[in-house]
Design a protein with these regions (language model features):
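Glycine-rich phosphate-binding "P-loop"
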Residues: 1-16
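Acidic/glycine-enriched connector segments
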Residues: 12-116
Length: 116
């Protein structure tokens, strides 16, 4: 099983671009699990992509009540431990997406970035 995080900006809303990019990156993968942080934007579009492709979804929602502002970063670290790769949709501004990219690189997880 190939576990790939699809993450990115909460303002990212171009599903066709996400689908085309993910299709390209995942073209040689057979058994795929989409890993989602459950945020609006790219994460939710990644879930839509998973449903369209009949890929299972591993959900990692941030626990904002327990961890406050640190919840997103804690969630990113958990996804980084679990996943085999990251596909990030980044506007070069989102701190949460930057943290996910940095976490993946630190864990030596192959990372593809779609800049928007």
């Amino acid at each position: 099983l190939f576990k790939v995080i699809i993450a990115g900006g909460r303002d990212f809303n171009d599903y066709l671009a996400l689908k085309k990019y993910c299709d390209h990156v995942l073209q040689n993968k057979i058994e795929v699990i989409i890993v989602s942080g459950k945020a609006n934007g790219a994460d939710k579009l990644g879930e839509q992509y998973a449903k369209e492709k009949n890929f299972p979804i591993a959900e990692f929602p941030a626990n904002w009540n327990a961890y406050g502002k640190a919840a997103g970063f804690k969630r990113n670290k958990e996804m980084g431990i679990y996943a085999d790769a990251l596909i990030a949709f980044w506007d070069c501004k989102s701190k949460g997406t930057k943290h996910m990219i940095d976490t993946a690189k630190f864990k030596d997880i192959p990372t593809k970035i779609f800049y928007y």
